[in-house]
Amino acid sequence: MRIENSKYPHNWGLSPCKGREMDSEMDKVLTVIVPVYNMEKYIRQCLGSLVIGEVLERIEVLVVLDGSKDGSAGIAYEFVERYPDTFRIIYKANGGHGSAINTGLMMASGEYVKILDSDDWVDRDAFCRLVDCLETGEADVVWSNYYWVYEMNGEKAIQYRDPFTDVVYGKKYRFEDIADRTFIKMHSMTIRTELARQAGRKIDENCYYVDVEFVMYPITEVETIIFLDEFVYMYRLGRSGQSMSMEQMRRNHRNHEQVLKSLLAFYDEQKFRHLDQAHLDYLEKGIARVVSSHFKIYLSFPCSGKVFAMMKALDEKIREEYPDVYKKVENKVVWAIRRSGYLLYYPGHFCMSLKEKKA
């Protein structure tokens, strides 16, 4: 891809970056990958939240412009000009969120890596403490919490206060000791860059809902984890066109199904590796969560025999080919539908419709 704009002194393809080349002696503790596609309304807040004097020299921010056509590039360039030792821009053809993450991972120089979506931002004080924790280099993954922040009124909400009961914050745990007690989401995860690269599988490109792939693929290599009692990530909710809205999930349901298929294929690969039981159980539990989400999408569609048949066929395939994943589904609605021979699909759809109308 070529950039024809006199404001930019070079033309960039996939690999070249604007920003000072990172000196091998300038060790970066953390690389923050910011995938960007047409986010000029939000990107200044996102990047600005990372401009923190205490950590600027210790972090690298890779702004991956994924074929963005609005003014996002110009805003990002302002940060490169002011902080060339921290901010870098990577231009690439549009390939979706996963493609931007894959590209960022290739270019990352930090010991750890974190994904920050360009419509989200970080809490400055909490982010500083995260970087301080990472600098010790003690664990493969550092977990930190996040707020949901509603676009309409700025109110914050939490999904859960603690990752599990009786967690000891700051303690280094063996992953196998806590694998059955928690589930890590992308917004909470900061992981060693080398482990993220060693996953052996690229994140799906031209596809939504790949956050779970970023977590699940490298988790099989994770041995240690520290839980940090900080709300670092500010996750914006209610933005128009947001992929996690139910309307968008219906529209992109095939993307969601593709992610599920990719995770099942990865699970097959890991079984042949004779993965230890704790990691295998974690994979099964994580994929089961995606199965539950897919049921939710089916239930949100207008009621039809076609949707009923699709839901039933997929679930029966999982029961026959992935029985351990099937059994790890915890959602009570899914199990009620299963036990009814899928006949509760119809009242389930009705309840889902009412819930969506109230939202």
What are the functions of these language-model segments?
Residues 49, 65-75, 96:
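A conserved acidic beta->alpha catalytic loop
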Residues 113:
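Short aromatic/hydrophobic "clamp" motif used to bind/position activated sugar donors
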